[in-house]
Amino acid sequence: MPRQAPTRPRSPKKPRESDGGGGNVLQRIKLCVVLTFPSHSSGYHVSANSTAAFRAPAASPHFPTLEEQVLAFWDQHSIYEQSLARRANAPTFVFYEGPPTANGMPHPGHCLTRAIKDVFPRYKTMRGYRCERKAGWDTHGLPVEVEVGKELGIHSKEEIEAYGVEPFIQKCQSSVWRYMQEWQTLTRRLGFWVNLEEAYVTYHQSYVESVWWSLKNLFDRGLLYQGHKIVWWWAQGGTALSAGEVGQGYREVADPSVYVLFPLVDQPERSLVVWTTTPWTLPSNMYAAVKPELEYAVVKDSETGQELVLAAALVDSLAGKLKRELTVVDTISGESLVGQRYQPPFEDYQTRLNDPTGELVTGGKESLYWRVVAADFVTTDSGSGLVHLAPAFGEIDHEVLVTERTRFVDGQRPELLCAVGPDGKFTDEFASMKGVWVKEADKTLTRTLRESGRLLHLEQYLHDYPFCWRADDDPLIQYPRESWFIRTTKFRDLMLKNNSKIGWQPEHIRDGRFGNFLESNVDWALSRERYWGTPLPIWVCQSTGRMEAIESYEELLAKPGVDGTQVWDNAKAANPELPDDLRVHKPYIDSVTYDSPFESGARMQRVSEVIDCWYDSGAMPFAQWGWPHQNDAQFQEQFPADFISEAIDQTRGWFYSQLAISTMLFGEGASIREAGTKANELAPSRDSESDYPHPFRNCIVLGLMLSQWYESAGKEGQPKTVLLSESEAEQADGKFTKKTGKMSKSLRNYRSPSEIFDKYGADAMRWYFFANQAPWNSIIYADQAIRDSIPEFLLRLWNTYSFFSIYAEIDGFDPTSATDVDEQLSPESLASAPTYRPISERSEIDRWIHSELHRTLATVIDRMDAFDNYNACQAITNLLDGLSNWYVRRSRDRFWAPDSDSPDKHDAYWTLYEVMLELTKVIAPFVPFLADTLWQELTAPFGDKALKSVHLCDFPKPDASRVDQKLSDSMRLLREIASMGRSARADAKLKVRLPLAKVEVILTDDSAIDWLQSHDALVREELNVKAVDYTTDGGDYVQYTIVPNFKRLGPKVGKNIPVVKKMLGEADGNQLLTQLQTAGFVELELASGPLKLDGEDIEVRLQAREGWAAAQGSGCVVVLNTEVTPELRREGLAKDLIRGIQSQRKELDCQYTDRIRVAVETSDAELQSAIEEHRTMICGETLADDLVIGTLPNAQQVAIEGGELYVAKVSDK
């Protein structure tokens, strides 16, 4: 290192808007800065071929370019593969990838999911675990079929079958890879390390056979059955949907709510007022339900004279809706209404069936249809207290029918009335509207009811209603259908127990959204009457109807008399490009038959259905390995998962399907397993435990990602204009309104991930996701928010390294003097350097930043182990703030010290170098690109002695002995004093460079005063004041007012709140505050007795007295004397001049060691005095050899704020 280095010029600081009374000196002068290399200069200039260990980096890095370089470096050196190889024998941390569907373009919401999935495996790998990250692709089901249908211009099942099932299936298979390149590019560019080469694919034969095995297991145990139930039905697609799928499609709609009159058969002048929100179901009405315990009123309609029957509690409500009087003439019980017959709203079925009766099991006869029945679900929350029942279109309605059927003898039971076909259109059963889609029939039906005098009232009813989750415009209907179901209700309690052991983030998901869904569990509607999906592996005897399940294609081929495989063979011969995985799909698998084991001569034929694609994805814990047919060791090792994460909509999707399948197959532990199947012999844990939870132990439930954009009103007949940033909207013509909402493909109200990466980089996006808020909160994608991540974190960290490298280059700091380093450059190994001193021997600020580093390490590890990336990032941000805004800033003079061999200077370099190395490791999981860039720079002097990548390093371990809590607390208070002092200046509009006479620091107690007084010089410099005083009594400088916290105090004191407010306002605020601080409460004497108010009951407000400016922190109040003397003003002008000269040094591309000469032209007497009075300070701060007041010959003129600046750059050769 050089024996001597020059004094460094201080970096210019950003000027404040106000001049604080001193005026902007650059508006009052003409300034010439002349760059020279005087022969007598004691400085030196670093040459271009210097052998320094470090090089100053680019001042304004382009992070996207740096990231592309890092990606190439990772590829070149197989860094991901190396990271796995280094943990080959380490304990496992298991991550499951929730499989996306690659037949749609990825958007920023997918970036959030993949970033969260990446950060924890990276962290756990650095913490010593082996984390295999197997990618996956969800390739079956409605998402794929709908997209292919759109491409082909077809929608219904009839159109698909007319097109041809075989070519349709082949198109589905090829379409799932349509955007594969975009997904792979996104994954790579975001820095998501995952094994794409060996990804599991749900249509692959090995995966399908694993699913078949699980279904055979359920079938053999009697858990998979065929039943006639009311299901949520997608009429346009011709298939039932599961509860999880239905849950993803709800949205708010307005439907007609009708009050319809059902005249009683035996009292035609009296009508039941029956309520429904689905008028289209009225032609299939079978019953009207009442609650036996309710009181019902018979009222007279003042307009029509009719007698109406409805719940007594709802008479006033209905009268209000009708806007006329309803007079109560009698009250009756609900029980008395049960059994009464009525005229149905539409008579088609009555005409055809002629109002039949049936023989009761208990004897006697009763009408099969159109009578009042009892039901506990009837309420008076809304409607009329009488509910229309159409059992074909409601699960609860259907349960009533099931109960009613048990009352009648066989052969005389009521049949289900259903006037709607599977296509959602009316059939011959309701001929007047045959072929009309039910949701389009409501208006016609209500008009018919009005014309017949049956419609009493019509209004719009706002409620949530399900639509197909993959066809947004298609509303679902409840519909009777024979489907295959899994008896998940049998496992409800076990699923709840399993769920109770899972570590959910946020925790309320466990007993809230997810727990509630489990509580209301219904049997899983598994089968789909569709085409592209895992075929249901059940073959049925064509003679006896008996069935068996098949668990693999190999088992199927081994069946006696197998036939039909030639259909696949012929297809493959005709098109050799067809993947072999298609042979286990429709239509090829449908052709495979074999001899029935149940009756000689009969054949076994597969049922026609495929299964819910959510079952596919939920089976991935074992199906990704093709287990149990292969890879037993991998499955045992990789089950259950330690961590999964997806968005909140997956509580009814992938989270549920995994938990349900795993609970049913693998149970609670070996002790409760049923014998006879391989699944029930499996211990579902990798360690000694064999209990819940499985198949995942921890789950982060991500919030929804919303978009923020700017939208024009749009001219008539023209589409709206959508812009994605405020600056674009400001520059565009017309008025734009800021909008926030869901990401929309049609609106294109978000940037593509590739645009974001090219513009800001992946690290900026990742840090925004991790550090902006907890990931389970809804997050808004906005350009500005991601852009802000750059200066707030990435650039601040880069500038800290830049500061280090600039001065390390100047001074020749070379860490390779440490000759016994390990590959991770641990602090312990750096201690072998001759100039390295133990932390305990270094200065207080060195010990402080090391203490902060190790406190941060402990916090980050604690939070990341709890899957809390947000608070981990807050700790990192706080450390970086302390490093850059306090340690580096307060240590600059140490780096600028002229004695290059000073132990204190060496300490500063070693401290900053150590902390930067450790911080680079800490940030590696969060911002992997910047981390590796910094690692390459910081470790370059060591060459191959250091690991190639930071991602091969261990995560730093906190050392409790390095933590000095007392020092941390004291320095935190000192930093708060500096921060509050700057806030007080800003509030008083006093420039930072304007010195002030005094600062008063008011403390809550005197325990820290001695330590603070030993740092007076630091406080004076930080706050630019001449004197500092500390006190615990600030009455001379500030006054306090105490006001009620109305939200908290209102319920506590009630009507006395005005009295309390008046008493607090008239009391001495300073005395009340003292009482609050000493006693913990404030006591007031009310007429009713004493009232104690704690800190939550009141608010303390601060006001500085005349001549002072104040700001309050958590541990102090800082009060500045705002009186500015002429002497202080002149010093402030001199410091303004220094800032101006520093700016011009930058404009002239001065090196940090370059000496200059300065000339100032001004007629301002005060400024001239300031220059003469502070000449030494000005020259010392700016490395000026000369400072002249005079003319400026041959100078270049530069425009500045309110004045002119003349600059000449010459060389003194």
Swiss-Prot record:
Recorded family membership: Belongs to the class-I aminoacyl-tRNA synthetase family. IleS type 2 subfamily.
Binding site for ATP: K745
One cellular component term from this protein's GO annotations in UniProt: cytoplasm
Gene that encodes it: ileS
SUPFAM superfamilies documented for this protein: Anticodon-binding domain of a subclass of class I aminoacyl-tRNA synthetases, Nucleotidylyl transferase, ValRS/IleRS/LeuRS editing domain
Record's comment describing the protein's domains: IleRS has two distinct active sites: one for aminoacylation and one for editing. The misactivated valine is translocated from the active site to the editing site, which sterically excludes the correctly activated isoleucine. The single editing site contains two valyl binding pockets, one specific for each substrate (Val-AMP or Val-tRNA(Ile)).
Disordered: annotated span: 1-24
Cofactor: Zn(2+)
Name used for this protein in its record: Isoleucine--tRNA ligase
